[in-house]
C-alpha cells in the first residue's frame, strides 16, 4: 500500500524552484502517458511513489498546472507566503475533499 505524504488541498512548495502550490489530485504512482516514463527517467525520481497534480504560481504570479513527484515537494508553512488565489483554492478543495474521496 502506498501512502502519500501530502493531501488534497494542502499547500506545498517546490523544493528546487521554491514556487508555492496547492495539491489538486494525487496518483499513487506515475500515471501520465505523455511524456512517457522513458523520456523523464533520466532523473532519480521514483515512478512507484506518489505523484501530485499541483496548481502553482510562478515568479510572476501566473498559475500553472504541474505534475510532480513527492520527492520534489515540501510542506508549506502558511506564514511564509502571501498568495490569496492559492489560499482560496486550498480552502475550496479542502471543503470538497470528503466528497472527492468517494
From Swiss-Prot:
Q: Which domain of life is it from?
A: Bacteria
**What keywords is this UniProt entry annotated with?**
Cytoplasm, Stress response
Query: Where the protein is mainly located, per its record?
Result: cytoplasm
GO biological process: one example: response to heat
Q: Name one GO molecular function term.
A: DNA binding
Q: Where in the cell is it found?
A: Cytoplasm
SMART domains to which the protein is assigned, alphabetical: YccV-like
Q: Which GO terms describe its cellular component?
A: cytoplasm
User: Mind telling me which Pfam families this protein's record contains?
Assistant: YccV-like (PF08755)
Function, as annotated: Involved in the degradation of certain denaturated proteins, including DnaA, during heat shock stress.
State the similarity comment: Belongs to the HspQ family.
Output the NCBIfam families linked to this UniProt entry. PRK14129.1, yccV
User: Could you identify this protein by its name?
Assistant: Heat shock protein HspQ
Q: What gene name is given for the protein in this entry?
A: hspQ
Amino acid at each position: 500500500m502506498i501512502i502519500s505524504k501530502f493531501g488534497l488541498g494542502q499547500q506545498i512548495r517546490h523544493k528546487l524552484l521554491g514556487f508555492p502550490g496547492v495539491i489538486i489530485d494525487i496518483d499513487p504512482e506515475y500515471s501520465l502517458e505523455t511524456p512517457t516514463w522513458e523520456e523523464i527517467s533520466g532523473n532519480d525520481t521514483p515512478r512507484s511513489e506518489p505523484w501530485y497534480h499541483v496548481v502553482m504560481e510562478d515568479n510572476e504570479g501566473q498559475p500553472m498546472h504541474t505534475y510532480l513527484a513527492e520527492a520534489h515537494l515540501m510542506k508549506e508553512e502558511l506564514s511564509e507566503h502571501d498568495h490569496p488565489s492559492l489560499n482560496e483554492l486550498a480552502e475550496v478543495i479542502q471543503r470538497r475533499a470528503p466528497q472527492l474521496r468517494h
